């Protein structure tokens, strides 16, 4: 049975459309500061287009600096095509736990008024993946500058761009490939920018969500069923370095989910996974267990609870979202207890990332030295069912990128600790009192399962 599944997975991957790549066309960036430097450099050199898809673009010092760069280059070149796609709901609310004030969308309006470009174009667009943020957001990643794709799970704000002391660690790849860039831009224009549900954010007369609920539902359904990247000169899996862009939305017919599952079935020696939140969908849990049963090696690099962006230090006032890092840690503890023998033998390596009070946002999959998945997908039930996600699958049959891959992985491991035993992780009775109360309440009313599905 497993042989049949493995063969089918191999056929699925072989049938994906790929674009041939040269090794010199892809560059792995090593830090959030380098990512910011590249964004600014690529903006300044853009001649025909700048397309950005991100969860949010924050009103803060880094957000202002990058937006000033965009407006400056737009002033110099009015014909430059600039489009920024942000989650509709996220742009119009304040940060969790923050006092009510002007939103990011309000700031986009102010900036448009401040700069007053001659043709006064809309640049920011709100993409509603569902009628409520909790049931789905725009988690599609990738910045396009002319023929260059800068791919990362990062959004635009102070910590993602290491504006001050703190940073949020992600992965960053720069791929210079005209057809890949065209494919990503065409996907935005053909599928994401459906103006029956997608509205400009840099205007004051935005519709209220409840006024366009029907349009949003129809938009989500159409995007889930039809959204895909098209490649003009695609080839079936060639025996050369190549890349395939992927999209997925919803629990069924989700190409990105299917590819991730197929990758897990293609492991011959070793699987490496990065995720900030230890909360795998059941299907991936089963596949990891099967790999371990079959003697394959698995390495999981996950953020320590302190490196979670929801973490609240015990001395600060507690908010409900602050329980999430503890919930993820309790998941991890159970997992490590279950596979205690494999951890002791070194077959399963679990690494916890922590660097002071900086945060960890990495996600990705590496299969042997053949497949590299760049994605914003957190490999959790929410990504599997609710959010719009994308990814770039790189196939490297001749290990042309091996040196860059090993360098990236070693950088990721730099601030990690290998777990030797599950008891190194705290358990419920060691958590702060408010966290204990909330997690016990969740368990009592069976809300913990629901929380894991949507967060």
UniProtKB/Swiss-Prot annotation:
CC per GO annotation = cytosol; plasma membrane
Which SMART domains does the record match to this protein?
PLDc
Give me any GO biological process, just one.
cardiolipin biosynthetic process
Q: Which Pfam families match?
A: PLDc, PLDc_2
Positions of the PLD phosphodiesterase domain: 134-160, 356-383
| Gene Ontology terms, MF aspect | CDP-diacylglycerol-glycerol-3-phosphate 3-phosphatidyltransferase activity; CDP-diacylglycerol-serine O-phosphatidyltransferase activity
Keyword Transferase attached = yes
- Record's keyword terms, sorted: Cell inner membrane, Cell membrane, Cytoplasm, Lipid biosynthesis, Lipid metabolism, Membrane, Phospholipid biosynthesis, Phospholipid metabolism, Repeat, Transferase
Reaction(s) this enzyme catalyzes, per UniProt: a CDP-1,2-diacyl-sn-glycerol + L-serine = a 1,2-diacyl-sn-glycero-3-phospho-L-serine + CMP + H(+)
Please tell me which top-level EC class this enzyme sits in. transferase
Q: What's the Enzyme Commission number for this chain?
A: 2.7.8.8
What CDD domains would the database entry show? PLDc_PSS_G_neg_1 (cd09134), PLDc_PSS_G_neg_2 (cd09136)
Is the keyword DNA-binding assigned to this protein? no
Q: What InterPro entries does its record include? A: PGS1, PLD-like_dom, PLipase_D/transphosphatidylase
* Cellular localization per UniProt: Cytoplasm; Cell inner membrane
Q: How does it sit in the membrane?
A: Peripheral membrane protein
Quaternary structure and partners: Multimeric.
Supply the PANTHER family for this chain. Answer: CDP-DIACYLGLYCEROL--GLYCEROL-3-PHOSPHATE 3-PHOSPHATIDYLTRANSFERASE, MITOCHONDRIAL (PTHR12586:SF1), CDP-DIACYLGLYCEROL--SERINE O-PHOSPHATIDYLTRANSFERASE (PTHR12586)
UniProt lists the family membership as follows:
Belongs to the CDP-alcohol phosphatidyltransferase class-II family.
> What protein name applies here?
CDP-diacylglycerol--serine O-phosphatidyltransferase
Protein source organism: Haemophilus influenzae (strain ATCC 51907 / DSM 11121 / KW20 / Rd)
Q: Which gene encodes it?
A: pssA
């Amino acid at each position: 049975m497993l042989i049949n599944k493995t063969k089918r997975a191999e056929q699925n991957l072989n049938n994906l459309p790929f674009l041939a790549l040269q090794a010199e066309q892809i560059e792995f960036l090593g830090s959030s500061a380098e990512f910011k430097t590249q964004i600014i450099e690529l903006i300044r050199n853009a001649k025909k287009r700048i397309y950005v898809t991100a969860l949010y673009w924050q009103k803060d010092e880094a957000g202002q600096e990058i937006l000033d760069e965009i407006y400056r280059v737009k002033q110099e070149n009015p014909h430059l095509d600039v489009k920024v796609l942000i989650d509709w709901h996220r742009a119009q609310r304040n940060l969790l736990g923050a006092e009510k004030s002007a939103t990011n969308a309000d700031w986009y309006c102010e900036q448009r008024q401040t700069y007053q470009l001659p043709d006064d174009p809309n640049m920011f667009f709100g993409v509603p993946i569902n009628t409520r943020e909790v049931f789905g957001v725009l988690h599609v990643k990738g910045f396009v500058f002319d023929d260059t794709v800068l791919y990362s799970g990062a959004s635009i704000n102070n910590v993602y761009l290491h504006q001050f002391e703190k940073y949020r660690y992600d992965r960053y790849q720069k791929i210079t490939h005209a057809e890949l860039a065209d494919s990503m831009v065409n996907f935005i224009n053909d599928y994401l920018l459906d103006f029956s549900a997608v509205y400009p954010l840099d205007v004051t007369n935005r519709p209220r969500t409840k006024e366009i609920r029907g349009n949003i539902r129809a938009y989500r359904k159409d995007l889930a069923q039809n959204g895909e990247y098209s490649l003009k000169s695609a080839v079936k899996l060639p025996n050369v370095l190549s890349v395939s862009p992927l999209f997925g939305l919803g629990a069924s017919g989700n190409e990105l989910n299917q590819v991730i599952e197929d990758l897990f079935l293609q492991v011959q020696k070793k699987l490496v996974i990065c995720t900030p939140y230890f909360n795998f969908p059941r299907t991936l849990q089963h596949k990891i267990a099967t790999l371990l049963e079959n003697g394959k090696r698995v390495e999981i690099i996950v953020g320590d609870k302190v490196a979670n962006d929801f973490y609240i230090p015990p001395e600060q006032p507690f908010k409900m979202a602050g329980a999430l890092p503890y919930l993820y840690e309790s998941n991890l503890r159970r997992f490590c207890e279950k596979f205690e023998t494999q951890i002791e033998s070194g077959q399963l390596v679990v690494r916890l990332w922590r660097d002071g009070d900086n945060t960890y946002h990495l996600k990705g999959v590496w299969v042997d030295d053949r497949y590299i998945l760049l994605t914003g997908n957190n490999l959790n039930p929410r990504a599997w069912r609710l959010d719009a996600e994308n990814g770039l699958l790189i196939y490297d049959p001749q290990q042309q990128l091996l040196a860059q891959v090993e360098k990236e992985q070693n950088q990721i491991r730099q601030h990690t600790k290998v777990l030797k035993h599950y008891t190194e992780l705290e358990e419920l009775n060691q958590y702060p009192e408010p966290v204990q109360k909330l997690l016990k309440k969740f368990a009592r009313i069976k809300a913990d399962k629901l929380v894991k599905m949507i967060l």
